[in-house]
Each structure stands twice: as C-alpha cells, then as structure tokens.
C-alpha cells in the first residue's frame, strides 16, 4: 500500500473473524441460487437480479443455544409474533454492477431466520441485519419484518470507523440475553457505525436506547438530504428573485436542522 492510500474494504472472512464464533457455530456451506429464487424472488425481474448479480452464496454460521450459548426467543403474544430459534450468518459475492440493495432485501426474504448478511463486491462490502416474524395470513410462514438495516463499507470509509464496527460485532461484546436481543445488538452496532461516519468513532458503544435515537436521527438526515437536494435544484431553475430567496432560506433552515441532528449523534 502506498503512503496515503486507503486500506481495502473488509470481506466476509474479516467479519467472521470479528464475530469470534466458536467452531461449533461455523457452517461454511455453499447455498444454491435456486433457494433464493424459489423463496425470495417475487417477479421475473427479481429472478434476473439474483441470477445476474450473485456470484457465490455461503452459509457461514448458525448462532443458536447449542453453538453460542444464547437462549432462543419466543414473545408472549397469543399467538406469538416472533420465535427465534437461530440466527444465520450468510455471505454473498456479488458481480460488478449488481443491484446491491435489492439483493439484500431478497436474500433476507428468502431465509426463514433472522439474518446477518455480508454482501461483498470488488472494493466494497455491505452488512445488513433484519428481524423476522410469523406471517399473519399464512400459518407457519416466517417473513421479513420491515426493511433490513444496512451499512456499507468501501475503500473511502475511515479506518477508525471500520475498526470500531468490527470490534462491536464480537460475540463477547453483543447483548446475549436471548437471540432477539442479539439481533438487535447487531442492528445497534450497524447504527453506531453509520453515526460514526458523520461524527467520528464513539468513545463507548451506544446503549439500546441511544442506538434507537441515532436511527431516527440518521433517517431524518437522509430525508433532509433529499429535501435539500430538491430545493437546490429548484433554486437553480427558478428565475424569480423572491422565489430564489425563499428557497435559499428554506435550504438554510433544513441545513441547520441537519447540523443539529449530526451534533446529537455524537457521544
């Protein structure tokens, strides 16, 4: 590596090492694409996304009571909404130009377990975690609950943030009361990483409550970025001075709100 060059993005091997799992939890099996197509693809377009975008699929590990010593989870609903018997860790090697975000969602839909997914492609890696629940209208079917929470790393990502993320993924650092709490801990780790891209690495890992507040602030920042971009585009096109002034004032107001949110993300 030359002076000043960014380190390469981590890969699935690095993530697995960071987790620090016991040998009993390792699976290391190849998964056929047909599993994703049969269980996750909704349209012909989704099938093409999987077929054209994914090179290799591997089931890296299975986290359950017998392999990592973390109890299962069943909520107290009648009937239960969630039952976590294990958490899967999968990796996907993507081809250049693959639709990364869509593939992540399709993979999470196709696996009937809460999932930590590693998507690797040349020069970049993304991690995503999603909760699951029982389907309300189809007995015995497990579905993705909401949108997977994602974080992306590439060669431009600050090394300190990547290092802090890898440390926060260690099984010994994650909450282990039950598998639901473990999954939420993984989501909180990704939240802390995304916040660190705006504020710098935290001095201490965020609490569950702090991570929840960070997720709300991060989503609001994304919404504000979109609004600001639209307003700037409108200001460039609008030739009327009063309208330009009004648009620029709104941009200034939203930018100030964004700055306050970023300040709130820090320790």
Question: How should each PLM-predicted stretch be described?
Answer:
Residues 1-136:
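N-terminal, leucine/charged-rich tether regions that mediate assembly and partner docking
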Residues 37, 42, 50, 54-57, ...:
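Weak global preference for isoleucine
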Residues 82-216:
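Extended, non-transmembrane interaction/recognition domains
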Residues 205-208, 214, 218-267:
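Alpha-helical oligomerization segments
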């Amino acid at each position: 590596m030359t002076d000043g060059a960014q380190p390469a993005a981590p890969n699935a091997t690095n993530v697995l090492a960071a987790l620090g799992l016991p040998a009993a939890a390792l699976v290391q099996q190849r998964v056929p694409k047909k599993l994703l197509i049969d269980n996750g693809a909704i349209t012909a377009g989704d099938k093409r996304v999987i077929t054209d975008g994914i090179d290799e699929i591997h089931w890296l590990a299975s986290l359950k009571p017998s392999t990592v010593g973390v109890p299962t989870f069943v909520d107290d609903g009648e009937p239960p909404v969630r039952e976590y018997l294990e958490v899967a860790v999968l990796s996907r090697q993507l081809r250049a130009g693959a639709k990364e975000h869509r593939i992540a969602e399709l993979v999470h839909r196709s696996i009937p377990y809460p999932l930590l997914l590693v998507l690797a492609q040349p020069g970049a890696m993304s991690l995503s975690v999603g909760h699951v629940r029982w389907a309300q209208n189809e007995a015995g079917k497990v579905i993705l609950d909401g949108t997977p929470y994602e974080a992306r790393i590439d060669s431009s990502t600050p090394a300190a943030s990547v290092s802090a993320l890898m440390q926060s993924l260690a099984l010994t650092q994650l909450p282990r009361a039950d598998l639901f709490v473990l999954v939420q801990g993984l989501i909180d780790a990704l939240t802390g990483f995304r916040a660190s891209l705006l504020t710098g690495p935290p001095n201490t890992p965020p609490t569950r409550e702090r991570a929840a507040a960070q997720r709300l602030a991060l989503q609001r920042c994304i919404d504000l970025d979109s609004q600001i971009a639209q307003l700037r585009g409108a200001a460039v096109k609008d030739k009327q001075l009063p309208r330009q002034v009004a648009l620029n004032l709104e941009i200034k107001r939203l930018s100030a709100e964004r700055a306050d949110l970023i300040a709130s993300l820090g320790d």
